[in-house]
């Protein structure tokens, strides 16, 4: 810091101070502060002395305590400011912010000049401030004063001695001259700008500034809200630095703009929106006549058995089914269950359209099938023309594909109901196509996990005729036929049908609810499986619920030639397939390796009178049913695979067929031996000699005839 400058002569200092006081007295109308004479002879304090020494001197004189401020530095420049600038020991440099300059301290003699005699300092300052504020200066002051910023209610400190905000300026004492110019911005604003500019300077080793680092650190603390941020401040600091110097590496897939969770939440918002413009009466009618099932009640009963989905998901499924009913002309709707997948799962809804609503869609499907048949016949004609051009025709194989089994009509058999699926509540519902017998037969021979995407091809052997949507529909038909059960007596056959059986031999295919059903006690439902029946038709090995003769000819097939008729007659007749009729008790189901196909239990064995009867399928794991009183329901939550006591063995490929039929034309003969060749040659010579002799004899006979 160096040695302090030599103290000026006390007499000169006293004369300069008296001259400045006389000049100020002529310009200001405010009374001057009297200076005690005993304070004039005090030597000035050395530079760098603590403020506590000055306070002790003031306490010794009995005067009021002066605030511990850094210095008395003027704020204005002009004629009066020249006197202050000449006193350079104060450490104030013109044109430079006061906060960044070295501030000096007034000596004791100068400080004692500011004290009044016989009057309290605070009272004198208050009267001086009120007088100056009422003048023109109060109108020209565009910036708030320090005493206005820091009110008496605000708690200050502790502050450092050299804090620029604590400097006692002459303006606070009422010595500010009246000037017409707009004052400069306060030093505090300049200090803030300079400090921020300093913090924004980037580091020498990276492009990161201290300001950005502190902002990120505070943002992270405010977002995470740790319990003790001070204890983990050091670790957070290291983590933030590591994140800056170790950016995220590039990935093969771009990060999604919106997380799947938020995207799903946005889609599910539409489920909670009520339709506007409807009265209370209309809403009541919709509640009573709506085909939407009571999913929450079903979930409550299955929850007692430890089965089902969460209450939140069940409610969202309820809203999704309500949305489906509003979009489609549905007469009956039911939540079938949930089939799990590797990537996404399927929520399945079993519905039945109102009469006449499905005819248009069936006609479109038939038109597409007819167009495909036309293309196939056109291709066959082109193939026949090519065969005529080729000289060596390729022999046709003797194998013939099995006859195509027609699928069952809508509202009957395996296609009695329609099924809609979606991956999550809020996503659009997709209608599954009708199932064909070939798809059901092939689905029994393969076992594939679902991926969650309906257009995924099913790669298997034997080849599955369709994609994942068709495979899903086939599995739904198989599970429904085997696991949909109800208490005995809940359904009954209609009186109009009678006891006549159809041609297929499957018996009755429809039933109705029994209005006189009063329910079966829970203990009886658990004790005997004869109190439960199947209310879904059994699927025959053919892939249909009603048997169809594949050899039965249609009108087009009767026009074929006699060759095809002979080939058909050579084939053996197919035996008719017969399955169990509707409403067959579960006690007649076949066992699985000496294992019962069903398991029954109570939801709570401690209170049987309030329990629910639960039935679980051992053949299709994930299929459950409950019954209590007049209520029952079925649900399936699983992977869509049938239980097999042994490991799954895929079907082996068929035997390789012969490319050409064996015959003498293509049979290779063995080479003859030498003896055989000689014998053959001798035989040929004898045959030639005999032929020549015969010719000669014939010629002689002809000559004789001519002579005669």
Swiss-Prot record:
GO CC terms in record: axoneme; radial spoke; radial spoke head; sperm flagellum
Record's keyword annotation contains DNA-binding: no
Designated name of the protein: Radial spoke head protein 6 homolog A
Post-translational modification: Phosphorylated by PKA. Phosphorylation increases in capacitated sperm.
Pfam families: Radial_spoke (PF04712)
Matches recorded under InterPro entries: Radial_spoke
Ranges annotated as biased composition (Acidic residues): 495-504, 691-708
Function: Functions as part of radial spoke complexes in the axoneme of sperm flagella that play an important part in motility. The triple radial spokes (RS1, RS2 and RS3) are required to modulate beating of the sperm flagellum.
Regions of compositional bias (Polar residues) in chain numbering: 10-32
Protein family according to the UniProt entry: Belongs to the flagellar radial spoke RSP4/6 family.
Region (Disordered): 1-94, 376-407, 495-514, 663-708
Quaternary structure and interacting proteins, as annotated: Component of the axonemal radial spoke 1 (RS1) and 2 (RS2) complexes, at least composed of spoke head proteins RSPH1, RSPH3, RSPH9 and the cilia-specific component RSPH4A or sperm-specific component RSPH6A, spoke stalk proteins RSPH14, DNAJB13, DYDC1, ROPN1L and NME5, and the RS1 complex-specific anchor protein IQUB. Interacts with RSPH1. Interacts with RSPH3B. Interacts with RSPH4A. Interacts with RSPH9. Interacts with RSPH10B.
Compartmental location: Cytoplasm, Cytoskeleton, Flagellum axoneme
Sequence ranges of Low complexity compositional bias: 47-56, 680-690
Originating species: Mus musculus (Mouse)
This protein's UniProt keywords: Cell projection, Cilium, Cytoplasm, Cytoskeleton, Flagellum
Disruption outcome: Male mutant mice are infertile. Mutant spermatozoa exhibit shorter tails, misshapen heads and immotility. Manchette removal is impaired.
Tissues in which the UniProt entry reports expression: Expressed in sperm and testis (at protein level).
GO biological process: flagellated sperm motility; manchette disassembly; mating; sperm flagellum assembly
